């Protein structure tokens, strides 16, 4: 399945979650396109609810179904709660950490920065957005990329970095201190529904 490239605003309203991270999509019309008010959403089947939750998380991270499912399978091989492990693995993606550090305004921008070779891990260029970070690794902007407007503007407006990361604004680098707790990850996602979705297939 291809990565979604359509209107994030319509997709955000349909799923009831801000895919841009700004929340602007839901400010005026916090209901799905085609509805004429917030109370007209039709009742969904159990399967449809599970599918919708899966799509919410997949579109939030902007990854293909294959990448998403492979990460889900990998999470199932770890000890602990499957759904929480899955959420943590997604948060450990390099593009997700670049976004969380505030080096990009959106996850899509973060993915592009990585893919275009502007990001290093432990001093070596890594251009794979799905690269999984380990505690202690350092994510930084390549020296010749540090003056890019997209990065400078993102850092300037960002006012929050999660506690599982340690960011040095002057050096434009951040350390992946530890694996995040579930409480530090998107609260609007019910990952158990996603586990149930794949379990039923």
Swiss-Prot record:
Disulfide bonds, paired cysteine numbers: none
Matching Pfam families: Ribosomal_S4 (PF00163), S4 (PF01479)
Entry keywords, A to Z: Ribonucleoprotein, Ribosomal protein, RNA-binding, rRNA-binding
Keyword rRNA-binding in record: yes
Molecular function terms, GO-annotated: rRNA binding; structural constituent of ribosome
Its biological purpose: One of the primary rRNA binding proteins, it binds directly to 16S rRNA where it nucleates assembly of the body of the 30S subunit.
Entry protein name: Small ribosomal subunit protein uS4
Organism: Staphylococcus carnosus (strain TM300)
Gene that encodes the chain: rpsD
């Amino acid at each position: 399945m291809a990565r979604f490239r359509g209107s994030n605003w319509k997709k955000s309203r349909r799923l009831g979650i801000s895919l841009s991270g700004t929340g602007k999509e839901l400010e005026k019309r916090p209901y799905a396109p085609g509805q004429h008010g917030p109370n007209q959403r039709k009742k969904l089947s159990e399967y449809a609810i599970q599918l919708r939750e899966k799509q919410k998380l997949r579109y939030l991270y902007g990854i293909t179904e294959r990448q998403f499912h492979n990460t889900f399978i990998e999470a199932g091989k770890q000890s602990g709660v499957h759904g929480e492990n899955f959420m943590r693995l997604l948060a450990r993606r390099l593009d997700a950490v670049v976004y969380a550090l505030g080096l990009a305004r959106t996850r899509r921008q973060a993915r592009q920065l990585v893919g275009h070779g502007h990001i290093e891990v432990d001093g070596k260029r890594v251009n794979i957005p799905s690269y999984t970070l380990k505690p202690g690794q350092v994510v930084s902007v390549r020296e010749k990329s540090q003056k890019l407007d997209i990065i400078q503007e993102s850092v300037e407006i960002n006012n929050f970095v999660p506690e599982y990361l340690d960011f040095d604004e002057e050096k434009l680098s951040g350390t992946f201190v530890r694996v995040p707790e579930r409480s530090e990850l998107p609260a609007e996602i019910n990952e158990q529904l996603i586990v149930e979705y794949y379990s039923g297939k």
